[in-house]
């Protein structure tokens, strides 16, 4: 099992609009291909303009296959275009992580 930890910085003051756009246009196609996220969070303290999503995959090949299918989905491409035009996101980072043997998530 791997966990894809994706961190996005949102323009100050644009978090509500970013969450609304994703909920209306991005959530359905993304979860259709990747399954539900382990978590979809936004910070309440510190760098408050930050979103973090966690997606679980069997392995790197599973992640690559599912993400390729998502990228080929016209509905996801429409969301990406709208997100780019809106310009709410400043940057993104991702890390592939492996849970410790004692982590409370199923491996």
Locate predicted features.
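Surface-exposed interaction/gating patches
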Residues: 1-19, 28-29, 37, 99-107
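Short, solvent-exposed beta-strand edge segments and adjacent coil->beta transition regions
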Residues: 3-5, 48-52
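Short hydrophobic/aromatic beta-strand micro-patches
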Residues: 9, 54-56
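An amphipathic, aromatic/His-enriched active-site/gating alpha helix that lines ligand/cofactor pockets
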Residues: 16-38, 47, 56-95
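Flexible, glycine-rich phosphate/dinucleotide-binding loops
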Residues: 46-47, 103
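Solvent-exposed, flexible loop/coil residues
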Residues: 52, 92-93, 101, 106
């Amino acid at each position: 099992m791997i966990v894809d930890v994706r961190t996005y910085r949102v323009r100050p003051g644009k978090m509500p609009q970013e969450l609304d756009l994703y909920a209306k246009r991005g959530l359905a196609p993304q979860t259709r291909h990747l399954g539900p996220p382990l978590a979809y969070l936004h910070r309440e303290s510190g760098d408050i303009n930050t979103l973090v999503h966690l997606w679980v995959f069997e392995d790197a090949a599973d992640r690559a296959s599912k993400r390729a299918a998502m990228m080929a989905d016209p509905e996801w491409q429409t969301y990406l275009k709208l997100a780019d035009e809106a310009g709410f996101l400043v940057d993104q980072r991702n890390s592939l992580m492996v849970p410790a043997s004692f982590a409370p998530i199923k491996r």
